[in-house]
């Protein structure tokens, strides 16, 4: 067979494979779309910082979340060298929005809650007084709380509820014994629930946590197929960069 014949055959084979893959994905999407979605009472959509292609940890991001169907807006919390709380995922460089500015902005928006994603706990005791100052103390909670942050959170922010961030092993996401060990870990930490990556989500996990009175928050779900897939599991919260898409699905 000469090269002139090989190339068209190779292209045709590749297109056939791609076509099969697309057909399979469309079929799975239809299956999830046709499945009835039953969400727990109080289900929420969290707009991840930087949602709707805005700048992360900006007031614009908060505004975009509010305007596109989110019940909760999320931003990252870091502290400057002198202990000022600011919105940043990494060590501050001096141009960040301050936590005070964010709380003041949120205080002007009714019914929106705030997910404060803790990146460091250096001066955590400064958060609650600012929340009181701007009358948003009953609207904030922490995520990003790793094992090593728990004691600092309890000591310096005892008034603020938090989710424990847990790296759930994908290979064990349906293993009852393993899942119960995570339940015990979350309970012992004092957290209200678990916050974890959608790739490790399972119906078994959600059900076991709910049976034990704990909340389930799943991040970060951005495409429509995964939204349907995770909604079917009935968690308490889904975090997304596309709150507009998710809110349209559940309406």
Task: Indicate residue ranges for each PLM-predicted region.
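Phosphate-group recognition and catalysis centered on beta-loop-alpha active-site segments
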Residues: 2-251
């Amino acid at each position: 067979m000469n090269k002139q014949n090989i190339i068209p055959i190779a292209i045709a084979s590749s297109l056939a494979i791609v076509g099969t893959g697309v057909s399979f994905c469309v079929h799975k999407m239809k299956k999830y779309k046709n499945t009835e979605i039953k969400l727990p009472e109080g289900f929420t959509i969290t707009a991840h910082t930087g949602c709707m292609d805005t700048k992360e940890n900006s007031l614009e991001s908060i505004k975009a979340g509010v305007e596109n169907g989110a019940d909760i807006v999320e931003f990252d919390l870091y502290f400057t060298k002198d202990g000022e709380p600011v919105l940043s995922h990494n060590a501050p460089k001096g141009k960040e929005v301050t936590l005070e500015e964010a709380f003041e902005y949120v205080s002007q928006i009714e019914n929106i809650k705030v997910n404060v994603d803790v990146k460091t706990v250096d001066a955590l005791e400064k958060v609650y007084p600012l929340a009181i100052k701007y009358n948003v103390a009953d609207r904030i909670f922490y995520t990003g709380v790793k094992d090593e942050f728990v004691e600092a959170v309890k000591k310096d922010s005892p008034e603020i509820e938090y989710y424990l961030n847990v790296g759930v092993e994908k290979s064990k996401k349906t293993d009852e014994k393993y899942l119960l060990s995570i339940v015990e870990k979350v309970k012992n930490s004092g957290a209200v629930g678990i916050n974890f990556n959608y790739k490790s989500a399972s119906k078994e996990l959600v059900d076991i946590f709910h049976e034990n009175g704990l909340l389930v928050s799943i991040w970060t779900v951005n495409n429509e197929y995964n939204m349907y897939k995770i909604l079917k599991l009935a968690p308490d919260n889904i975090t997304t960069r596309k709150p507009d898409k998710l809110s349209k699905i559940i309406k």
